[in-house]
Amino acid sequence: MGQTITTPLSLTLDHWSEVRARAHNQGVEVRKKKWITLCEAEWVMMNVGWPREGTFSLDNISQVEKKIFAPGPYGHPDQVPYITTWRSLATDPPSWVRPFLPPPKPPTPLPQPLSPQPSAPLTSSLYPVLPKSDPPKPPVLPPDPSSPLIDLLTEEPPPYPGGHGPPPSGPRTPTASPIASRLRERRENPAEESQALPLREGPNNRPQYWPFSASDLYNWKSHNPPFSQDPVALTNLIESILVTHQPTWDDCQQLLQALLTGEERQRVLLEARKQVPGEDGRPTQLPNVIDETFPLTRPNWDFATPAGREHLRLYRQLLLAGLRGAARRPTNLAQVKQVVQGKEETPAAFLERLKEAYRMYTPYDPEDPGQAASVILSFIYQSSPDIRNKLQRLEGLQGFTLSDLLKEAEKIYNKRETPEEREERLWQRQEERDKKRHKEMTKVLATVVAQNRDKDREESKLGDQRKIPLGKDQCAYCKEKGHWVRDCPKRPRKKPANSTLLNLGD
């Protein structure tokens, strides 16, 4: 009584430090909370037979991997480190995992050849009998270091020789069906358990090489944005490929050739060589150490040996560091200032565009608390005029965080009038203006009418005075009595015209 049942999930949680160390050795990070969520919920909801308590069955792990590595928007790149660590615990189990491993399946017997080894030519056949010739033995990859890169259109992996005996004349059954793509497509024989990695264990316990296919590179390039547009997304994709596929040096060059431009590749390689560690673990400046650890030409690394695999592991880590370093852009604040809030854009959408501009045109992280002041100023001064004016008048603005300003901006935005309300307000304002103008015009007209009325009154008084009748002996010109107007001394008189008298004698 009181005993608890140990499950694969609880077992990994009890040995969490070792699980994290295992993931760290593979170049990834895992977190306990997400580990539990994926095992108990996310992978169960994929409907591939994953139990809530977890499992170390490679069949279940492979089914989950097919969902995670699905191309395009159907995949789950964020879950790659977790399923990779699960597979690592199942394929290379520590001592505390071995008792919980499922029993191994009996090996599938190879089918008998359809035709026995002929000692003499067949007497009857549907096809003409061709003379047999011993085929040349395929070389073990990688070939001569001076040879060119592997052909991208190669779909069949280069096999490793299984022995020195002659090959059977009948059709042979491969030990593992070749992959059509590096995205873990469904295999024809689900009973055979194999790991879809470029370097995996072959029939003779030797690593077997699986090159990239043209369809893989095409899908990765077409379903992801360019590095110049979204370096974070493409870096995450390449990281998942490096972790899960464990590519060789040639594979890495093909990957960079397909996904990056020439200028971008140069930046990535330059940043990666800056991160080559020295003996003290810090980046070194010694050219020989840099060329040995991160070579620019094909190295003589044999992935079949532990030393070669260690070189490749360090090379992939440095390549990933170079991608992250090249993703940092030069500062271009002019592009950030061009991001302004639209007339009908919400403050939240504008803030997201502003942060994206900081990520794209500056090396700064807008989520970094040290950059909060710059983001706040850009958010205030690049908002729409009505929001900007009200945000600037807030009391204690220096104590506001970006979240507080976003809330205030949302309040201002939500209180905005609708187009109908704005039209009604403008109509009322125009009506009030017209009423005021009409009132002023009425006053002006009343003043003019009053002035005209007073003038008419004065003129009427003067007219009445001029119509007073004159006296009998009163002058009509000077209004004095004693004479008439024709005899008025004050009246100007016309001078008589000078007449020239002509003498009759003249």
UniProtKB/Swiss-Prot annotation:
Residues 100-119, 136-146, 156-171 have a biased composition (Pro residues). A motif (PTAP/PSAP motif) lies at residues 118-121. The keyword Membrane applies. GO terms for biological process: viral budding via host ESCRT complex. It comes from the Viruses. The keyword Nucleotide-binding does not apply. The record marks Y127, P128, L197, P198, L445, A446 as: Cleavage. A lipid is attached at G2 (N-myristoyl glycine). Keywords: Capsid protein, Host cell membrane, Host cytoplasm, Host endosome, Host membrane, Host-virus interaction, Lipoprotein, Membrane, Metal-binding, Myristate, Phosphoprotein, RNA-binding, Viral budding, Viral budding via the host ESCRT complexes, Viral matrix protein, Viral nucleoprotein, Viral release from host cell, Virion, Zinc, Zinc-finger. Residues 97-208, 417-440, 486-506 are annotated as: Disordered. Residues 120-132 have a biased composition (Low complexity). Residues 417-434 have a biased composition (Basic and acidic residues). This is Gag polyprotein. It comes from Feline leukemia virus. The lineage of its organism: Viruses, Riboviria, Pararnavirae, Artverviricota, Revtraviricetes. The gene is gag.
